[in-house]
Amino acid sequence: MVETIRFIPFDKIIFYENYKGDRLETLINNMGDKKILINPPVAVQIQSNQYLILRGKYRAMALSKLRCMNITAQIVDEQCIKISSWLHQLPKNNELIMRFQENRDFYFSEKKLAHHKYMVKMYIEDKIYYLYNDIKGDIGEVIPLLNSIMEKYDKNYKYKKIIKEEYTSNSNYITLEFPKFSMQEIITLVNKGMLFPENIVRYIFNVEMLQNLMIPINVIRSPEAFEFEWREILDKLLKSV
């Protein structure tokens, strides 16, 4: 596991999803006060000099804001990654349901359409509905549609993020299930300058993840000057495995 930890130049990393400024600011202040990074972000190498951050985007961004030219990251092999999606569950609200049904940004259907990828599978009581991007199926239309869907409830209604295995039918809730995207689809969208809304894509790692690893910010900021301290951190990690 030690060999999976690397220093990566911040200008060599890219992100796949958007972020909230207030949450980032809170983390910057917290990390700045404690002067510690708890657990490095997780990334996958997608080109010889480019890495996609899969988990820990706020930590990666905060390190940059704290004057770190490089970030520490746990690098995982693409073969060890399974891509799924999150479900959003929120209290049933008839006004919200009408917003979905009457919105012209997408096609609302009670039937699953053959050869078309739905953008949301919606569970309302014992019925299932599907939202499509106007039947076109263009990958470039995915992000605007997902943003349009989440704008209907993200700020005004509190939702709970759950996994598929946790879902049970409940007449008091609306549950939205997002589709799965391949790594290639995600990279294609990112290369077009598009970012997913938060809490859509879910990564499952079939590899041991670093837990409770604490790295001083000054070591990350100046690894050459603190080479001895960095070696101590790696030695402790190696002994704990």
Q: What is each of the regions a protein language model found here?
A:
Residues 1-52, 58, 64, 68-70, ...:
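Short alpha-helix boundary/capping and kink motifs at helix termini
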Residues 52-53, 176:
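Active-site-adjacent beta-strand anchor residues
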Residues 53-54, 186:
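Long, contiguous hydrophobic alpha-helical segments, chiefly transmembrane helices and signal peptides
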Residues 55-56, 179:
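Helix N-cap/beta->alpha junction signal
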Residues 58-59, 182:
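Alpha-helix capping/helix-boundary segments
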Residues 61-62, 185:
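Phosphate- and divalent-cation-binding pockets in alpha/beta enzyme and binding domains
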Residues 69-71, 75-241:
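Solvent-exposed functional surfaces
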